[in-house]
Amino acid sequence: MSMGIRLDEKFQDRRKDGIEDAFMRQAVSSAQNRLRDGRLNAAGELGDWEAFRDHSEEIRQHVLEHLDYYLYQLSENVSKRGGSVFFAETPEEANRYIREVIRSKQAKHVVKSKSMVTEEIGLNEALQEEGCTVVESDLGEWILQLDEDPPSHIVAPALHKDRNAVHETFTAHGYTGSNDPTELGRYARQELRKDFLKAEVGITGCNFAIAESGAVGLVTNEGNGRMVTSLPDTVISVMGMERVVPSYEEFEVLVNMLCRSAVGQRLTSYITTFAGTRAVGEVDGPEEFHLVIVDNKRSNILGTQFQSVLQCIRCAACINVCPVYRHIGGHAYGSIYPGPIGAVLAPLLDGYENYKELPYASSLCGACTEACPVKIPLHELLIEHRRVIVEEKKQSPFVERIAMKGFAVTASSPFLFEAAEHVAPFATSPFATSGQIEKGLPAWTDSKDLPQPNKQTVRDWFKKRGNA
């Protein structure tokens, strides 16, 4: 199962679409500036931000090194709270289990809170095939669902839209008001409330699951997570297998880092933890709770040179500083995980066949690594991906392989190298104008200057200087 957005289009075409979308680029640029500045201000309030990053990295590394222990502890405590736990190796297994739960309830209306992993496994499409109406309750995700538009950002999925675009979408679905944000928000609240009240099943993601208690933690700004977990009689939470913490102590640290890194807030409006089924005497909460823990090739990443990518807490700080994302937007990546984290993660989860271009969609400036609150060496992992693509997978472009082999032969022979230096000015003349190569290599010359080789070589120049 592919988790791509538009894999029927080549990356070069998606990239071009993004670059040529002036409105999207302006929206992304403004959002990046706002989110980046907010993160820096919020981080400064903590004092020694680097110490917090070090501690957060230690927490995530410790969990990954002892993941089997904490997942077992989590599953035991969920069961003690009356919940059911299902370990899904593949997206198909996860979707099949969730469909069976919904089928057993004869449910037709499902409401969801924001969840990257459910998008990763294609859950909405699987449930719609079952005949269910699935409603996203996160405002940004709901807007995109109405517009049949994929998300472009991990934290702010509708980042590429402004209020006029939202107004146009709402109007197409019966809205008659203005484009005032308050009025738009009121309409969304009224419509979503109807879905909350008639939903038979609620589905959530999981920011962090707490092993010592069996609780699931949700971080939201809209309160939709609490509605999804308190109103339906059946609640299903879906989590990537790495999204577990030992205790509330570590949960507190990572939530603090998540909120400040994602949106520049000390805390989001709602930090929700819930565990198991409704207890005797409680008036809300589910009568039935299921926790689906998804592998989807994560276990293949453990113990490899890419293991540190599983430290990710999905804050999107790397995306908010990435110059490539700034120019091409999220849709160009063809994955629900865009930006630097997507360029590292997508090939691991869905194969180099689909995403071998993404590791090259980077300037390797290292801004992503500096911004990451859990210190994932993202730019180093991108370089490692490139090495794997070229040396192990042998998937570099054919022309590039031939060119590199030819250069290796030429550069290792003084005679051939000197001959090439003298031939190059004449060989490139048909493609050059005023000393600049302008044809034949569009991937380079469309965005960079490429001077024509000089007729006087360095060796010739040196000989003349030496005789002077």
Curated annotation (Swiss-Prot):
- Chain positions recorded as [4Fe-4S] cluster 1 binding sites: 312, 315, 318, 372
Domain spans labelled 4Fe-4S ferredoxin-type = 303-333, 352-381
SUPFAM superfamilies registered for this protein in UniProt: alpha-helical ferredoxin (SSF46548), NagB/RpiA/CoA transferase-like (SSF100950)
Quick one: which residues bind [4Fe-4S] cluster 2?
A: 322, 365, 368
Keyword annotations: 4Fe-4S, Electron transport, Iron, Iron-sulfur, Metal-binding, Repeat, Transport
Residues of the region (Disordered) are: 442-468
The record, for PROSITE patterns, names: 4FE4S_FER_1 (PS00198)
What one GO molecular function would you report for this record?
Answer: 4 iron, 4 sulfur cluster binding
The annotated regions of Basic and acidic residues compositional bias extend over 457-468
- State the superkingdom: Bacteria
Q: Which GO terms describe its biological process?
A: lactate metabolic process
Similarity comment: Belongs to the LutB/YkgF family.
Q: What functional role does this protein have?
A: Is involved in L-lactate degradation and allows cells to grow with lactate as the sole carbon source. Has probably a role as an electron transporter during oxidation of L-lactate.
Name of the protein in question: Lactate utilization protein B
